[in-house]
Amino acid sequence: MTNIRKTHPLLKIINSSFVDLPAPSSLSSWWNFGPFLGVCLGVQILTGLFLAMHYTSDTATAFNSVTHICRDVNYGWLLRYLHANGASMFFICLYLHVGRGLYYGSYTYSETWNIGILLLFAVMATAFMGYVLPWGQMSFWGATVITNLLSAIPYIGTDLVQWIWGGFSVDKATLTRFFAFHFLLPFIVTALVMVHLLFLHETGSNNPTGIPSDPDMIPFHPYYTIKDILGFLVMLTALATLVLFSPDLLGDPDNYIPANPLMTPPHIKPEWYFLFAYAILRSIPNKLGGVLALVMSILILAIVPILHMSKQRSMMFRPFSQCLFWLLVAVLFTLTWIGGQPVEHPYIIIGQTASVLYFLIILFLMPMISLVENYLLKW
C-alpha cells in the first residue's frame, strides 16, 4: 500500500517539498538560513497578530497602547520585545542568506534570485512601516524623513508624498494606513516565499562547490530536518537571550519619548538593519542622487547574475574573489557604523569612501578579478 503522504493531494505537496525532496549531500550550515527565515516569519506573524489585538492606530493613543501592552497585557512585554527583536533576527538571517547566495553563486538561478530581491524589498517596507507604529520620536521623524525622500522624484514628487501622508504632514491618516499595510504585507511576503520555494524546487538546491550534484543527492528528511531543528534551537535561544536580558539593546532610546512634531531629535536614524543604506543615502550631497543610490544599493543585486564572469559558479575555489567578497562585507559593516554617526568630519568622508567602494567592488572589481582567475586557470 502506498504511503498516504505520497497520495494525499495536500500531503504530497508537503512531502515533495520537505520530506522526499532530493538535496545535495554537501550543504553546509550556510544553507540553514532559508529555513531560519521561515521560522522568523512565523514568529513575526504570530506575535504581530496578538499585538494587533491590543494596538490602536490613532496618533492620540498609539504610544499609550504600546505602553499598555507592555504593562497590562498578559506577557505583552514578551510579545512586544519578541516582535521588535524578531525583526532584527529576521534581518540578520536575511543578510546572511543573501551573502551566502553571493558567495556560492546561487544567483545563477535567476527566477529564485529575483523573487528573493522582491522579498527583500517587501520585508524592508514592512519593517519600516512597523517602526512607525509605536509613535515615538524616532518613529515620527523616521517616517517624515524617509517618506519625504519621494519628493525628490521630478514633477510628481510633492504630490506623491502628500498622497502617501494623506495630508500635509505625517499624521493620523499616515499612521492608520501604515498599520493597515504593516498587517497586510507579511501575508504577501508569505505568498512570495511560496513562489520563491516553487522556483527553487524547479532547479534543485545549489551546493558549496557550485558543481551539479545530481549524482549525489540525499533525502531532505531526516538529514536536513534534524540539521534545521538544531539550527532553530540555536537561533531561538539567541533571540530569547536578547529578548529576556537586553530587549532594548538594538532599539533607540528616543522612541520612548512620545512623537512631538515640534521637536526634532538631535540625530534621526533608522533601525540598525537599514543603516548601511542610510549611510549611502547621506553620502551623496544631492537629494535625487542620494535616493537613486539608496534604491540601487539593493537593486544592484538584480544585475549580479549579468556581472558573473567566472567559469566557476562558487567562490569556494577562487581565493582572489573571496578576498573581495570579505572586503565587501567589511565595507557593509563600515557603512552600518557610519549610518549611526552624526553628519560631521571625519564620518562624512569615511561614508563617501565606503559608498564608492561598495559599488566599485560589485560593479567592477568582482567581474575583473573573475576574468583574471579564468586567465590564471587557463580557462
From Swiss-Prot:
Its membrane topology: Multi-pass membrane protein
Annotated TM spans: 33-53, 77-98, 113-133, 178-198, 226-246, 288-308, 320-340, 347-367
Subcellular location: Mitochondrion inner membrane
Cofactor(s) in the UniProt record: heme b
GO molecular function, one term: ubiquinol-cytochrome-c reductase activity
List of residues binding heme b b562: H83, H182
Binding site for a ubiquinone: H201
Cofactor binding mode and count: Binds 2 heme b groups non-covalently.
Binding site for heme b b566: H97, H196
Any single Gene Ontology cellular-component annotation: mitochondrial inner membrane
Record has Heme as a keyword: yes
InterPro entries in UniProt: Cyt_b/b6_C (IPR005798), Cyt_b/b6_C_sf (IPR036150), Cyt_b/b6_N (IPR005797), Cytb/b6-like_sf (IPR027387), Cytochrome_b (IPR030689), Cytochrome_b_C_euk/bac (IPR048260), Cytochrome_b_N_euk/bac (IPR048259), Di-haem_cyt_TM (IPR016174)
Keywords: Electron transport, Heme, Iron, Membrane, Metal-binding, Mitochondrion, Mitochondrion inner membrane, Respiratory chain, Transmembrane, Transmembrane helix, Transport, Ubiquinone
Family membership: Belongs to the cytochrome b family.
Complex formation: The cytochrome bc1 complex contains 11 subunits: 3 respiratory subunits (MT-CYB, CYC1 and UQCRFS1), 2 core proteins (UQCRC1 and UQCRC2) and 6 low-molecular weight proteins (UQCRH/QCR6, UQCRB/QCR7, UQCRQ/QCR8, UQCR10/QCR9, UQCR11/QCR10 and a cleavage product of UQCRFS1). This cytochrome bc1 complex then forms a dimer.
Further remark: Heme 1 (or BL or b562) is low-potential and absorbs at about 562 nm, and heme 2 (or BH or b566) is high-potential and absorbs at about 566 nm.
Name used for this protein in its record: Cytochrome b
Gene transcribed to yield this protein: MT-CYB
